[in-house]
């Protein structure tokens, strides 16, 4: 394998997306790998006072990884509560893909 330089690393598109069928919603979604910064923010958001906060964890993860065809997030963190009211089967499928990609 070749040694990589700074420019190569920083210019590489290393955030793959996976299209996932969600029949409960009548279509498909794209799940994207998080950046290192996004992953750190996610991990920080689920730990409070030394304890893990699992409240609405699937929806909280889903809003961070669901993207459009260009890779841009389609939800804000503030949408997690509303998304959490959607099908647990759909959220489980997205959450599993997010875990696999991240």
Task: Locate predicted features.
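Extended acidic low-complexity intrinsically disordered regions
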Residues: 1-16
């Amino acid at each position: 394998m070749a040694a990589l330089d700074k420019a190569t690393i920083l210019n590489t598109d290393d955030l793959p997306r996976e299209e996932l069928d969600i029949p409960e919603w009548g279509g498909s979604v794209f799940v994207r790998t998080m950046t290192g910064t996004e992953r750190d923010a996610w991990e920080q958001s689920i730990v409070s006072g030394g304890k893990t906060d699992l409240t609405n964890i699937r929806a909280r993860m889903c809003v961070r990884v669901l993207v459009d065809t260009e890779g841009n997030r389609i939800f804000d963190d503030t949408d997690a509560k509303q998304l959490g009211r959607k099908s647990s089967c759909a959220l489980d499928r997205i959450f599993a893909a997010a875990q696999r990609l991240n």
